[in-house]
Curated annotation (Swiss-Prot):
The keyword Transmembrane helix is annotated on this UniProt entry: yes
Membrane topology note: Single-pass membrane protein
Keywords tagged on the record: Cell membrane, Endonuclease, Hydrolase, Membrane, Nuclease, RNA-binding, Transmembrane, Transmembrane helix
Family: Belongs to the RNase Y family.
Job of this protein: Endoribonuclease that initiates mRNA decay.
SUPFAM superfamilies reported in the protein's UniProt record: Eukaryotic type KH-domain (KH-domain type I) (SSF54791), HD-domain/PDEase-like (SSF109604)
Region of interest called Disordered, as start-end residue ranges on this chain: 118-141
EC supergroup of this enzyme: hydrolase
PANTHER family the record matches: RIBONUCLEASE Y (PTHR12826:SF15)
The protein's name in its UniProt record: Ribonuclease Y
Length: 535
């Protein structure tokens, strides 16, 4: 029993211990399970986070790969499009090239057809011309046949007439016929000789003028109507004016020159149209400035002194010019007259330098023609001497020059040259003509005389506008400093007969609308051209 109880107790104890052990183990297992669960949860969280990271990485990688693939696809598409476009362009280019070649062939074929058409037209014209020529020749042959028959009848009649003539009458008839034939031949030869002489004369004259102009180089300074005098300082202006202007009034009254004192620093201007009086005033003013004594009495003294000095300078100018031109044995009065031309101007051109140049040109021309060179130079030098005193003596400078040339026993050729160089009388020597030509060369070229460039250009422009104002005028050109207008007309509008009428109309309009020195030559040219090509 006890054993049973012990057994039962032992069993109970074993149960209790087993339960306790089992509880402990269950608790440990639970704790282990919880720990395992926690670990599993942590691992799950870690795995989930890692999975999310991996998923994000995979997503980004996929995006990058997708973007790269898209770019690659885009590049491939662009490359294919480029290749396709190039293929299309190449096809278009080849088609355009073919079209261009086709157009070129068509143009060449058209040109060939045009040329053939022109050739056919020209051949047709040639055939028409030949046909017309044959017709004309046939008519001409018929006319000549009629003339031959008529001549045969006339000769027959003449023979019948001669048969009835005496020997003297027959001789007279033969001489008359011979004279008529010779008269016609002589007239033809005379006309040909005159034409040849005229052509050679014109060419020789041009050559002579060209040689003369090339061998002479003149120097010119444009003359003015004012002279500037430089002062050491502006204080000198007050001394020149003087108290209440008495000094300047004295100088102006004694010299006849306007003394202009303005704001221009250290300059006094002398204005006057008489170069001699202006030069005397300049010399006087410079002497007053150098001397320092400026008052009316001193001014009168210096003016008189400089007048005498001016006479000596005039004589020196005349002697130097006479020596330069090679004109010895000139009368002293003529030397003084020529010296006065140093202070005489004509349209701004110094007359003494002009006279020297005319003398040299006339001498060159005379030498080329075998004339008296010394006489030609002397005549050219003296041709304008009347201008030195034409303001003091009544009459033109030509009349005054003739009178003084006769008075001082100059050569008759010199007298006639002075009288004829402006066309007042007819020249009676070759030298007179040469001096007139030299005078025109020296004075009429552009720039020798003071015609402003603006007026000069305007005159040429007006001359050309007058010519082009007529219907049928193609071009017009003003030549030789406005001394010739050359007009080119349209041949389809202006006939040969109308050319003459046009030249007269242009001449009349120029005379009515322009002011000009000398003469203007109007030349109208009508030119017809025919151009063809040999194939």
């Amino acid at each position: 029993m006890v054993n049973i109880i012990l057994l039962i107790v032992s069993a109970l104890i074993g149960l209790i211990l087993g339960y306790a052990l089992i509880s402990i183990r269950l608790k440990s297992a639970k704790e282990a399970a919880e720990l395992t669960l926690l670990n599993a949860e942590q691992e799950a969280v870690d795995i989930r986070g890692k999975a999310e990271v991996d998923a994000e990485h995979i997503k980004k990688t996929a995006k990058r790969e997708s973007k790269a693939n898209r770019k690659e696809l885009l590049l491939e598409a662009k490359e294919e499009a480029r290749k396709y476009r190039e293929e299309i362009e190449q096809e278009f280019k080849s088609e355009r090239q073919e079209l261009k070649q086709l157009e070129t062939r068509l143009a060449e074929r058209s040109l060939t057809l045009d040329r053939k058409d022109e050739n056919l037209s020209s051949k047709e014209k040639v055939l028409d011309s030949k046909e017309q020529s044959l017709t004309d020749k046939s008519k001409h042959i018929d006319e000549r046949q009629l003339q031959v028959e008529k001549l045969e009848e006339e000769k027959k009649a003449e023979l019948e007439k001669v048969a009835a003539m005496t020997i003297a009458e027959a001789r007279e008839v033969i001489l008359m016929e011979t004279e008529n034939k010779l008269t016609h031949e002589i007239a033809t030869r005379i006309r040909d000789a005159e034409r040849d002489i005229k052509d050679r004369t014109v060419k020789t004259a041009k050559d002579l003028l060209a040689q003369a102009m090339q061998r002479l180089a003149g120097e010119y300074v444009t003359e003015q109507t004012i002279t500037s005098v430089h002062l050491p300082d502006d204080n000198m202006k007050g001394r020149i004016i003087g108290r209440e202007g008495r000094n300047i009034r004295t100088l102006e009254s004694l010299t006849g020159i306007d003394v202009i004192i303005d704001d221009t620093p250290e300059v006094v201007i002398l204005s006057g149209f008489d170069p001699i009086r202006r030069e005397i005033a300049r010399m006087t003013l410079e002497s007053l400035i150098a001397d320092g004594r400026i008052h009316p009495a001193r001014i009168e003294e210096l003016v008189e002194k400089n007048r005498l000095e001016m006479d000596n300078r005039i004589r020196e100018y005349g002697e130097a010019a006479a020596y330069e031109i090679g004109a010895p044995n000139l009368h002293p009065d003529l030397i003084k007259i020529m010296g006065r031309l140093q202070f005489r101007t004509s349209f701004g051109q110094n007359v003494l330098r002009h006279s020297v140049e005319v003398g040299k040109l006339a001498g060159i021309l005379a030498g080329e023609l075998g004339e008296n060179v010394a006489l030609a130079r002397r005549a050219g030098f003296l041709h304008d001497m009347g201008k030195a005193i034409d303001r003091e003596v009544e009459g033109s400078h030509v009349e005054i020059g003739m009178e003084f040339a006769r008075k001082y026993k100059e050569h008759p050729v010199v007298v006639n040259t002075i009288a004829s160089h402006h066309g007042d009388v007819e020249p009676d020597s070759v030298i007179a003509v040469l001096v007139a030509a030299a005078d025109a060369l020296s004075s009429a070229r552009p720039g020798a005389r003071n015609e402003s460039m603006e007026n000069y250009i305007k005159r040429l422009r007006d001359l050309e506008e007058i010519a082009t104002s007529f219907d049928g005028v193609q071009n017009s050109f003003a030549l030789q400093a406005g001394r010739e207008i050359r007009i080119m007309v349209q041949p389809e509008k202006i006939s040969d007969d109308q050319v003459v009428i046009l030249s007269h109309k242009v001449r009349e309009k120029i005379e009515n609308n322009l002011d000009y020195p000398g003469n203007i030559k109007v030349t109208v040219i009508r030119e017809m051209r025919a151009v063809d090509y040999a194939k």
